[in-house]
Design a protein with these regions (language model features):
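Histidine-centered divalent metal-coordination motifs
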Residues: 15-21, 179, 213
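Divalent metal-dependent hydrolysis catalytic cores, especially in the metallo-beta-lactamase
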Residues: 36-58, 67-88, 109-115, 138-139
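Catalytic pocket-lining loop regions of alpha/beta-barrel enzymes
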Residues: 27-28, 138-139, 151-268, 296-300, ...
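Short active-site segment of divalent metal-dependent hydrolases/proteases
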Residues: 18-19, 182, 216, 274
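Conserved, mostly hydrophobic/aromatic
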Residues: 15, 103, 112, 131, ...
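Active-site gating/metal-coordination segments in enzymes
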Residues: 77-191, 323
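Alpha-helical scaffolding within the catalytic cores
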Residues: 60-67, 95-100, 124-128, 194-197, ...
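Mid-to-C-terminal alpha-helical segments outside catalytic/metal-binding sites
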Residues: 1-14, 21-69, 126-130, 260-265, ...
């Protein structure tokens, strides 16, 4: 728990990674460029004292992650999002098996999310079933702009994507996290377009679509979709660090999200190791919409922040919350 000014917050970090971006694992220049693009986000949007060297960033030890999330940081539970990118990384960037191994060594700390790619066809459906059997998945992380051979992306509205979403429904994998945010080199911007979420959310009302990075830079598109689709949620990873570098921009983002979605469908995420939960949580709890913007956006109350920082994600993943905080 994080406590400040008599208020306590249960923290569920909805977006973390334990990756291997080391040169030895980079398959080609695209893998190298992908890591360096992540690193640019890290250095440009982090407070100086939290910046790492590129070498530290490419591959960090398990012990450092545990310290940053749970000892120095305030995470009570963290969601490990699997990102394969096997066209660019020899052993994948961070796979379900790699994430599952670290979760097994730290019981109660992590939720492991799987991954699928509709371009894998029938074989991929079988693999998803095996992943579910092994890790009891409640969620997956999807990268619609991931490259595969000559293909540079896919859509949630594709016929094969529907097959996989139907399989998720059948297996009880109800939390569908989708990267719909800033482009990452060398991926294509349009392959991250949020528009296909509208189609899938309508077709699969029993699934929850967590739009990671809230569609940035297409925030308005995301908000107009989410306001009419009650099973669409906003993952705040990537939006959160603007607390430090662009606080008024962050106020605008939060104001729009709360106006259109309310506080019940927004999920905190650090996107570790790009950013660290310690300073994000501290700054978010201290943050308030500037006075001159409150006439349009209102204020963020401690109750709203509690939902965003952990209670909403706890509800999606059936996590036990300390009794005094269980108001969801």
């Amino acid at each position: 728990l994080y406590s400040k000014d008599g208020q306590s917050y249960f923290i569920v970090d909805g977006h973390t990674h334990f990756w291997d971006g080391s040169p030895a694992n980079q398959l080609n220049r695209y893998g190298e460029g992908f890591v360096k693009c992540f690193y640019d986000y890290h250095t440009n949007l982090s407070p100086y004292e939290y910046r790492w060297t590129l070498e530290e960033f490419e591959r960090f030890p398990e012990e450092r992650m545990i310290y940053d999330l749970f000892e120095s940081g305030y995470d009570d539970v963290a969601v490990l999002q699997s990102t394969y990118l096997t066209d660019w990384f020899v052993n994948g960037f961070n796979t379900t098996a790699q994430n599952g191994d670290i979760a097994a060594r730290h019981p109660g700390r992590f939720i492991v999310n799987g991954r699928w790619d509709p371009r894998d066809g029938e074989a991929g459906l079988d693999k998803l079933e095996r992943l579910q059997e092994r890790w009891q998945l409640k969620g997956v992380m999807l990268y619609t702009a991931e490259w595969k051979g000559d293909s540079k992306g896919w859509k949630l509205s594709d016929p094969w994507a529907y097959r996989y979403l139907e399989k998720c429904r059948e297996l009880g994998i109800v939390n569908i996290h989708v990267h719909k945010g800033p482009t990452v080199y060398p991926m294509n911007r349009d392959a991250f377009d949020v528009a296909d979420v509208d189609d899938a959310a309508t077709a699969f009302p029993g699934l929850r679509f967590i739009v990671e990075h809230v569609g940035l830079p297409r925030l308005e598109d995301f908000c107009w979709i989410a306001t009419q689709e009650p099973n669409v949620y906003g993952g705040l990873a990537m939006a959160m660090p603007f607390l430090h570098s662009r606080p008024r921009y962050f106020a605008q983002i939060m104001g729009e999200l709360v106006y259109w979605l309310g506080a019940d469908r927004l999920l905190f995420g650090s996107d570790y190791a790009i950013w660290q939960p310690k300073w994000l949580v501290e700054k978010f709890v201290d943050f308030q919409i500037p006075v001159d913007m409150q006439g349009e956006y209102g204020v963020l109350t401690p109750a709203m922040k509690r939902k965003i920082l952990g209670l909403n994600a706890a509800r999606l993943y059936d996590l036990k919350v300390p009794g005094e905080l269980d108001v969801a």
